[in-house]
Design a protein with these regions (language model features):
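Outer-membrane beta-barrel initiation region
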Residues: 37-113, 118-125, 145, 156, ...
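Outer-membrane beta-barrel translocator/channel fold
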Residues: 85-162, 282-320, 330, 417-424
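Transmembrane beta-strand segments of outer-membrane beta-barrel domains in Gram-negative
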Residues: 56, 115, 122-289, 378
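Transmembrane beta-strands of outer-membrane beta-barrel proteins
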Residues: 49-51, 79-83, 109-115, 199-203, ...
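Bacterial N-terminal signal peptides
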Residues: 21-32
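C-terminal outer-membrane beta-barrel translocator/porin domains of Gram-negative envelope proteins
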Residues: 226-361
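N-terminal secretory signal peptides that target proteins for export/translocation
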Residues: 1-17
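Residues on the lipid-exposed face of transmembrane beta-strands in outer-membrane beta-barrel proteins
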Residues: 53, 67-71, 97-101, 155-163, ...
Length: 428
């Protein structure tokens, strides 16, 4: 698990029809690039630390203020520590901390990560239903929401084993040595995991709970989850791949806290990246990125004593990455299927680099994207059903590489809402 994946999992900003959020994001960026807020006084030159303020506004929190920090190379060159937290005008608060990619002495190819997130949102916009966390929201379900209190707690541990094949066969292999700049050459992938790419097997334990607090009742939801993932990153760069593919399959076994029902979830994803020729002086890289993601819950049933995961852990669409024009978990059912496409452009023109360099920050490039998502949920895993009455969203965004972290800002539109989101890492 990488730093960006951990942060992406829980710490995000999403606004609904709210222009004010964009203003606060601009203010936050200006504050973050002020040298008074940066700390880099480390005795070890291999450690790089940044602490920045966070200022934003959205419909769930109102105006919020916080602090975020990351230290790269603490203890080990490939490792990182991070922490973020905020409080807001409507008494919302959240904190997240993590340690990423640490190795044990004399244990090769194993990387360990830990993550904690807690939040209290007294004015959270959630869907109207009689079973918060478990109500089915099918493909044709109406959009109805209300304000409710939501308390969330997440704890996660992960062990990652990088298989000794492909790129990892090289004695000098390191997770930190992959290209992150468009000028850096990327290895040409083959079609065999033995010869190229990074293959990993991940074991993950997660405990997550979410309480929905209404005037008349409190609904407690949550689950303990054990998850295995097998992935093959057959690209030349994790952040800006110009060619190649990625594939991942995962299985989750969960036990719900409140009814002790057990469930199982299967997920798969495959992505392809296709470089377009750059014939002009205004572009550094042009790429078309395509993705197919799917999920199925074989233990699913429709009864009140359901053997199915909560909506925030199950087969769902909407939110930050899949059907981005709908809010998180807008659609939730037994199965899900979604196509995603992006056109990504890194231009030669980058006005932030010179300004950031003077302040001691590294912002080597930004990337513009046009994207479209198309998919649906269904009560059974049926290929023909998936391709009937599919939901579509479209939008545009910008990605900025700042201090080695890729910050993604997306604006997406659907038939229900216009959404903007700020998050870490590419959508896929």
């Amino acid at each position: 698990m990488t730093l960006v994946t951990l942060i992406m999992a829980k710490f995000y900003i999403q606004s609904v029809k709210r222009v004010g959020a964009l203003c606060w994001l601009a203010v936050s960026f200006l504050l973050a690039t002020h040298p008074a807020w940066a700390t880099q006084n480390n005795s070890d030159p291999g450690i790089r630390t940044r602490v920045v303020p966070l200022v934003f506004s959205n419909d769930n929190t109102g105006v919020a203020y916080g602090l975020g920090g990351v230290s790269l190379g603490v203890g080990q060159p490939q490792a990182a520590l991070f922490a973020l937290g905020f409080t807001s005008k409507n008494d919302s608060k959240a904190v997240t901390v993590g340690a990423v990619n640490y190795k044990l002495p004399h244990v090769k190819r194993w990387y360990f990560s830990g993550f904690f997130y807690g939040s209290d949102m007294p004015q959270y916009g959630y869907f109207i239903n009689d079973m918060p966390g478990y109500a089915i929201r099918g493909n044709d379900s109406p959009f109805e929401s209300q304000r409710t209190g939501v308390n969330t707690l997440t704890k996660r541990l992960q062990a990652r084993w990088v298989l000794p094949i492909g790129a990892a066969k090289d004695p000098g292999f390191s997770l930190t040595r992959r290209p992150i700049l468009p000028e850096q050459p990327q290895l040409s992938p083959t079609t065999h995991p033995e010869q190229s790419g990074i293959s990993s097997l991940r074991f993950e334990w997660e405990q997550q709970s979410r309480d929905f607090i209404e005037p008349s009742k409190t609904s407690e939801t949550g689950a303990d989850v054990f998850r295995t993932k097998l992935d093959w990153d057959n690209t030349g760069s994790r952040l800006i791949p110009a060619s190649g593919s990625r594939a991942r399959i995962s299985t989750s076994w969960g036990k719900n806290h409140e009814n002790h029902k057990r469930w199982r979830l299967y997920e798969a994803s495959v992505s392809g990246f296709f470089k377009l020729p750059v014939k002009s002086a205004w572009a550094k890289q042009q790429v078309v990125a395509l993705n197919l993601s799917l999920a199925d819950t074989p233990t699913w049933n429709d009864d009140a004593g359901q053997a199915r995961p909560p909506d925030y852990l199950g087969a769902r669409l909407g939110g930050l990455s899949r059907l981005r024009g709908y809010r998180a978990s807008r659609f939730f059912d037994r199965s899900a299927w979604v196509y995603r496409a992006e056109y990504r452009l890194i231009p030669q023109w980058q006005p932030l680099t010179r300004f950031a360099d003077k302040l001691g920050y590294r912002i080597p490039w930004w990337q513009f994207a046009l994207f479209a998502d198309m998919g649906r949920v269904a009560p059974s895993f049926n290929l023909a059903r998936f391709h009937e009455d599919m939901k579509t969203t479209a939008g545009a965004g910008v990605r900025i590489l700042a201090e080695g972290l890729l910050i993604r800002v997306d604006f997406a539109h659907s038939d229900e809402e216009f959404l903007s989101a700020v998050i870490i890492d590419q959508a896929f």
